[in-house]
Amino acid sequence: MDFDNLLNLEEQYYQEGFLEGQNENIKQSFLEGKQYGLQVGFQRFTLLGQMEGLCDVIESYGLHSPTLEKNIHTIRTLMKGLKMNNDDESVMEFERVLIKLKNKFRTILITLHRLVKDKRTPTVTFEVFEDVSRAIAGEIRGFVENEDIAKNKTKQNQAQSW
């Protein structure tokens, strides 16, 4: 009989536990990375979607301002050129274009305010627009079929069920 395996039994269980913990950590890290990526992507493109929507609304007013139309066209052109990739070059390009988009959108809001000239309504500034965007992007919730069950789940459990 060979009793050498019995002497190494503790080491064997230690190694099995270590490998099991390592594999579980890899799964959890992947899940956290996926959640973070979804959140960042949602936050970035929420602002662009709101800009696009407000450009549609402003165009529907029919104000016929050449400056306004030119800036809206510029915003739409810049948005069409954005790539949805996640490599370093695309992210840097996105950040560069986002700065241009924000500045053009500020110009649109200022022009719109001058054209409307209604003193009774509060001015829509870009800061107000960004606050609305942050409020929307901060309310990220996953889709759940049964609301009662969702209230009892922690965010981690809900994310794992995605």
Curated annotation (Swiss-Prot):
GO terms for cellular component: cytoplasm; nucleus; Yae1-Lto1 complex. It is found in: Nucleus. Its main location: nucleus. Changing E147G: Lethal at 37 degrees Celsius. InterPro entries: Essential_protein_Yae1_N (IPR019191), LTO1_adapter (IPR052436). Pfam families: Yae1_N. The keyword Thylakoid does not apply. Keywords: Nucleus. Coiled coil: none annotated. Changing H113L: Lethal at 37 degrees Celsius. Residues 17-53 are annotated as: deca-GX3 motif. Changing D4A: No effect on interaction with YAE1 or the CIA complex. No effect on iron incorporation into RLI1. Changing F94L: Lethal at 37 degrees Celsius. Present with 784 molecules/cell in log phase SD medium. Belongs to the LTO1 family. Essential for life in oxygen, but nonessential under anaerobic conditions. Required for biogenesis of the large ribosomal subunit and initiation of translation in oxygen. The complex LTO1:YAE1 functions as a target specific adapter that recruits apo-RLI1 to the cytosolic iron-sulfur protein assembly (CIA) complex machinery. Forms a complex with YAE1; the complex bridges the interaction between the CIA complex and RLI1. Associates with the CIA complex (via its C-terminal tryptophan). This is Protein LTO1. It comes from Saccharomyces cerevisiae (strain ATCC 204508 / S288c). The lineage of its organism: Eukaryota, Fungi, Dikarya, Ascomycota, Saccharomycotina.
